[in-house]
């Protein structure tokens, strides 16, 4: 019985300690490091003025931008633009370079306060944290000037980009090559960029399309090793992920030539990606430049296409820019046949558990309208799925408790003869038809479930700012209350390491009660471990997302109920009330 209990709580402890290690040894130091780096970058940022001339090839640095430091409004106002207005997005397209460099997400705010500013995804290069996408061409001598970062396009069709009204931009160079770019947008986050190239010149021209996602500086949001942020793409059917730190330390990463695939930059909740023409080969490259300020660039370069005099060609790119909503990303993956585009969301190693778990939670959310309730119902479903295994576990624990007196007799009989004791114990298990390892399998199986749930709560945007009841306004953030100031009654917060919210306390109480369901271990070390473990876990989980803590508290409650029912059926005494009573009863001093 004690062995099963010990295995159970050791397994839980290891699971949580791994997550806590990520939090304290990686997340917090990285938060401080990123904050300091961002502050230094903002103090020292200087970029050389832009120069004209030949457009750079993909994988090379863009011509420098204007000196950063302009406000976003100033940078947007100084160039001619085409407005973007959809149910999900607002912003504009810069007619210089036809850049997507002004984009905000209407449905998402910076904080849980609905009056807080909406999320800004793209900003012009002239701002401190420029972030944009663009599509251009590399030509030969016969092609003349081709569309690139400095090209000024003319709006020739449409006035505002909406789901119902595409816009057309045109550019004709000195060699008689006309580029007509039609841009359309759906109700969510996918732009279609279709270029029609007509050669009215006297010589054939060779053109290679390229597409870039460029970001100045690393994002200031804290990074964490539980998910990937940075460069992402699919080449040759394989997912390519390169973090910011890795690309800073190494040469550019070139996944290689591929037919079919995509590339871009991903954050925890947002992403920018380009899907090149899928029927022709192209190269993908991830690069980092330090020409004045850190610049991260993901780009592709397509194979050259020859357009004869009097002939035309068409090049179609897709640009994703927005929130990584699961249903939207899955729809794009299927509708546009984009290879592994669903990998834009980092489901982790246990994706085969994480994805179904999210879909289950999303189903219950749509049913009940609250993700907190969805977590509770999902926990019940998971409990039902694992009920046969858990039933065996608790039945085994109950049987172990029944033979506890016989085990104690064997220990006295064999004393220090460990080999003899082990053989006698195995014979006892055989006679009583007890499998001492029966309680381990449910625990081992449930560990991936725990990690999968943590992943769902942490990385899915659907959980961001999702409220529960009462004071929990964001299930993806820690419980905001703290016992230090009597849960808000006193006018101070206290040190961060003492922040202990109501839900972590509830979780600690349920864990304490669950452990008191069984007799206190005779071994003093185990007894001390069982006594202090709930308190330690309470403080450790205080910094975890509230949704995970609520899950743990609810799971403990269901486990207590399940264990009580099984123990009653097995005729085994439930020690909970005796153990609680013993906490307030003075133990007699041992006789001298």
UniProtKB/Swiss-Prot annotation:
Spans traversing the lipid bilayer: 7-27, 367-387, 441-461, 486-506, 530-550
Pfam families per UniProt: 60KD_IMP (PF02096), YidC_periplas (PF14849)
Keyword Cell inner membrane in annotation: yes
Keywords: Cell inner membrane, Cell membrane, Chaperone, Membrane, Protein transport, Transmembrane, Transmembrane helix, Transport
Record's subcellular location: Cell inner membrane
Main location: membrane
UniProt-annotated stretches for the region Disordered: 38-74
GO molecular function: membrane insertase activity
InterPro entries listed in its UniProt record: Membr_insert_YidC, Membr_insert_YidC_N, YidC/ALB3/OXA1/COX18, YidC/Oxa/ALB_C, YidC_ALB_C, YidC_periplasmic_sf
GO cellular component: plasma membrane
Lipid bilayer topology: Multi-pass membrane protein
GO biological process: protein insertion into membrane; protein transport
Source domain of life: Bacteria
Compositional bias segments (type: Low complexity): 41-69
Family of the protein in this entry: Belongs to the OXA1/ALB3/YidC family. Type 1 subfamily.
NCBIfam families (UniProt xref): PRK01318.1-4, yidC_nterm, yidC_oxa1_cterm
Subunit-structure text: Interacts with the Sec translocase complex via SecD. Specifically interacts with transmembrane segments of nascent integral membrane proteins during membrane integration.
Task performed by this protein: Required for the insertion and/or proper folding and/or complex formation of integral membrane proteins into the membrane. Involved in integration of membrane proteins that insert both dependently and independently of the Sec translocase complex, as well as at least some lipoproteins. Aids folding of multispanning membrane proteins.
Name of this chain's protein: Membrane protein insertase YidC
